[in-house]
Amino acid sequence: MTPQFHRFAVEELLDGVYFAPTYGNTLMGLATHKPRVPEDNYAIIYYPPLPRAMIEVVDPDQPDRVVEYGETGRVRLTTLTREFFMPRFLERDEAEREPPCDLYPWDGVRNVRPFSRFQAAVVEGVY
């Protein structure tokens, strides 16, 4: 979801309704969004459900290197539950790395979208 659509949804489509975007999958569960504040310019920022899942944003060409805050990279997920461990799984998404905030004191992701190198082949949707 783009910041432009987020603004449209909040101000025009769903005026007066609380809009709660989510990001997730079967491995991670649902990442919650950071409550909207004006300085975020309608960017949607998600924080994973720690300690179950940890998201990192890594250099697509060097997936062992985490990018700096604000830089774009590929989303890498680590999941750990009593029944399951999936370390460092490269997702089909890219995003900007977002610093921790008061509500979520761990890294998040901003402006999640399909990984651009897969753009022609990625099928989007709700599964």
Language-model regions, residue ranges each:
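Active-site glycine/GP-rich loop and adjacent strand/helix microenvironment
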Residues: 1-127
